């Protein structure tokens, strides 16, 4: 089952490596990971998406709490929360599909952020399901040259 962990940790050298090492040592895969400083520059917020049963995730949480750099671990996927991901993709364009690509991007509330004579670079934010649906549809209208995704960021509501 998909799980999203939000980890507050010290913004220090080696902190990221220790968290990733813990997952690696236990044989757990990290599906996505994001990390950035918080409003307090001494702290960072890490969001990890992984897959595991409740017992495995509980064990990971216990092990994370033992790391000296980790201040708080919250499983945000089980409560009411907001999650987003950003995708940038470069698509091949031709004259008879330009309007279709623009229209699909607008329907998904995305943006065209760069235009050349042969390509568009599109930007879209939303849930993973929304981004997956967009990619599936856009493939019907254009060749996707390159895709880069940010990974999930999330926050609990309330």
UniProtKB/Swiss-Prot annotation:
- What's the name of its gene? ilvH
The GO terms this record gives for MF are: acetolactate synthase activity; acetolactate synthase regulator activity
Instruction: Write down what this protein is called.
Output: Acetolactate synthase small subunit
Mind telling me which InterPro entries this protein's record contains?
Answer: Acetalactate_synth_ssu (IPR004789), Acetolactate_synth/TF_NikR_C (IPR027271), Acetolactate_synth_ssu_C (IPR019455), ACT-like_dom_sf (IPR045865), ACT_dom (IPR002912), AHAS_ACT (IPR039557), AHAS_small-like_ACT (IPR054480)
According to its UniProt record, which reaction does this protein catalyse?
Answer: 2 pyruvate + H(+) = (2S)-2-acetolactate + CO2
**Where in this chain does the record put each ACT domain?**
4-78
Cite the Pfam families for this sequence. ACT_AHAS_ss, ALS_ss_C
Which EC class does it fall in? Answer: transferase
Keywords recorded for this protein, A-Z: Amino-acid biosynthesis, Branched-chain amino acid biosynthesis, Transferase
């Amino acid at each position: 089952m998909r799980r999203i962990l939000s980890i507050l940790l010290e913004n220090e050298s080696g902190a990221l490596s220790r968290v990733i090492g813990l997952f690696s040592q236990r044989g757990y895969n990290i599906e996505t990971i994001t990390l950035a400083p918080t409003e307090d520059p001494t702290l960072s917020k890490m969001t990890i998406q992984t897959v595991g049963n409740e017992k495995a995730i509980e064990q990971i949480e216990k092990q994370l709490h033992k790391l000296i750099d980790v201040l708080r671990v919250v499983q945000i996927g089980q409560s009411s929360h907001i999650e987003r991901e950003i995708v940038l993709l470069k698509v091949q364009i031709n004259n008879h599909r330009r309007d279709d690509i623009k229209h699909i991007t607008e329907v998904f509330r995305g943006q065209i952020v760069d235009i050349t004579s042969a390509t568009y670079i599109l930007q879209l934010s939303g849930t993973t399901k929304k981004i997956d649906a967009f990619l599936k549809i856009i493939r019907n209208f254009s060749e996707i040259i390159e895709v880069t995704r940010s990974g999930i960021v999330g926050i609990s509501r309330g």
